[in-house]
Structures are given as structure tokens and as C-alpha cells.
Amino acid sequence: MRNNPVLPVSDPPLAGENDSDGKGVDDRLFKGSAMTKRGAYAALSYMACAVMLVLFNKAALSSYDFPCVNVITLFQMVSSSLFLYALRRRKIISFTAADSFSIDSASTFVPVKTLFHTLPLAIAYLLYMLASMASVRGVNVPMYTTLRRTTVAFTMVIEYMLTGQRYTRSIIGSVGIILLGAFFAGARDLSFDFYGYGVVFLANISTAVYLATIARTGKSSGLNSFGLMWSNGIICGPILMIWTFICGDLEKTINFPHLLTPGFMVVLLCSCVLAFVLNYCIFLNTTLNSALTQTICGNMKDLFTVGLGWMLFGGLPFDLMNVIGQLFGFFGSGLYAYYKIIGR
């Protein structure tokens, strides 16, 4: 094996494998194990990348008035696949836990049989992506924030159904505070829209299924974080390409007046790079910690996103109930992080 620099990956634990403290992986599934230093770095990296990505996407969609969200997602997905291809060809990364970098053919990066095995994850990812985009249009912003915060509850239920994962009372209590904060944040705007509610809850369910499926698919397929990202791109990329063509988004993109301006290209490039890093952090965070931890991190980064977005882009009306709800949500997320660090 050549002496190549290898990027850190999250390899799926093998059945019966022991970790560094001598305990089997399965023995810790139902306990409030403390977050490792590597897991903490993964969580912090995700939050930093997520905030930056939202700001760059906001710049592309608002500052430049780019009309096609799906095309940005397609660019990000294609860019991620190209990054993975280049890194794998140069043998800087591997796609499996036991990869010895002996495979030189791009066509055999991930066997077709393994791709079919990861199909449920890819479908969950595509549904999560499309439902999340549609949900923004279905309800107003306060209600959207309120309903999306309930994803933590969906994640706990889905994790229990798929993996039997259970949590301590401390963790459940912190999640309850987050849900209370979500209610306060949208309490002034509880207008009922059946279609809008349905789309947002579909986005919540698909998000929970996607996050819970990451660790499960990684363990059963033998793929690490990069391998799962590659499989997602190979399966979802062509589907999203066809979808954007049918919707007419590709034609709108070609006719976009700022498409080749340096400023827009820099914003789009940064968005694609950050999306690649963010997807890697999501896989790493979900595998090293849990799907629920990933969801909680998403709630914590909302506060920084709202603050930076208000300072850079403005347009955020002040509402005391919304502020109280945001603080409740941040407090609950902080409690969750504290309990994970001390192992309760």
C-alpha cells in the first residue's frame, strides 16, 4: 500500500466488534454513552458548515434572485460526486471499511449489488430533499419553524422502530423542552392549512427516516461515510436531473442573466464545496453519535443561522414569543449536548 494521505472516515462497526473500552458495540446501543472527542468535533463541524451553507444559498437565491432551488441542489450533488471520484482515484479516501486501495477501476468503486442495498437510503434522501423544498412554500416561516422542530420527536420514534434505540429520561426531557420552544416560536401563527401541514410533516418523517437509515445502512452495507455519499450521488443524481428537466428549471438556469458573472459563480462554487463538506459531516455525525444528535445539532445551528441571517440580510421582524421559543429550543439543545457529554 502506498503512503497516501487518507482523510478521516466513519467506518461502520462490524457485528460483534469491540471498541476501545472492550465493550461490544451492541452492548451500548441502549445506554446514554458519553460523546467522544471525535463525535464532538463532528457535531461542531456540521453546525459550522450548515450555517455557512445556508448563508451562501441565501445569497444565491435572494441577492442574485436565482429562481431554481432544485438546480442548486443538483449542482451540489454533481460536485460532491466529482470530488469523491477525484479523491478516490488518487487513493486519498476509501469507500469501504476494508478497502485496501487496490481497486483502480471507477466502475467498481461500489458494486452494483451494494448500490441496490443502499437504495432505501437514497430514496429516503431524495424524498427528504424534495419534501423539505416543498414544505417551505406550504406554510409561513413561524409555522414552518414550529413544525420542523418536531422532527426530533419523529427521529426518536423512527430510531426506536428501526434499531430499537431507547433514550434516558434526561435526553427525553431535553427533547421535550425543544418541542415546547417550537410551540412558543409559532404560537402567534397557528393558522391551519391541511396541505401545508401535511407536506411539512412528510418532510419531518422523511428527515427522520433518512437520518436513522444512515447508520443502519452503513453497518449492513460495509460502506463508510464516503461510500454512502457516493452511492447517494450515483442513484439520486440522474433522478434529480430528470426532475429539473421536466420542471423546466434547466431552461430557466440557462437563461439566468447572472449565470456567468464572477460573483454568482463564486457563491455557487462555495455553496457546492460546503454542501460536500456538510454531507460528509452529516454522515460522520450520525454514525459517530446518533440520528437524534444530528437532529439536535440542526436545532442548535438555527439560532446562529437566524442571527447571522438577520445581520447580513435583514428582513426579520421582531416577535417576543418567537424569541422566547428560540431561546427555549436553544436551551433544550444545550441540555441535550450536556447530557451527551457527561454520558447521561
Curated annotation (Swiss-Prot):
Instruction: State the compartments where it is located.
Output: Golgi apparatus membrane
The tissues where this chain's protein is expressed are given as: Expressed in roots, leaves, stems, flowers and siliques.
Query: Per the record, what is one GO cellular component?
Result: Golgi membrane
Q: Which GO terms describe its biological process?
A: UDP-N-acetylglucosamine transmembrane transport
Query: What membrane topology does this protein have?
Result: Multi-pass membrane protein
Q: Which UniProt keywords apply?
A: Golgi apparatus, Membrane, Stress response, Sugar transport, Transmembrane, Transmembrane helix, Transport
Q: Which InterPro entries does the entry link to?
A: Sugar_P_trans_dom, TPT_transporter
- The region annotated as signal peptide is none
Membrane-spanning segments: 41-61, 66-86, 92-112, 114-134, 167-187, 194-214, 226-246, 264-284, 304-324
Segments for region (Disordered)? 1-23
This molecule's function is given as:
Mediates the transport of UDP-N-acetylglucosamine (UDP-GlcNAc) across the Golgi apparatus membrane. Delivers an essential substrate for the maturation of N-glycans and the GlcNAc-containing glycosyl inositol phosphorylceramide (GIPC) class of sphingolipids in the Golgi apparatus.
Q: What PANTHER family does the annotation carry?
A: SOLUTE CARRIER FAMILY 35
What is this protein's record name?
UDP-N-acetylglucosamine transporter UGNT1
Q: Which organism is it from?
A: Arabidopsis thaliana (Mouse-ear cress)
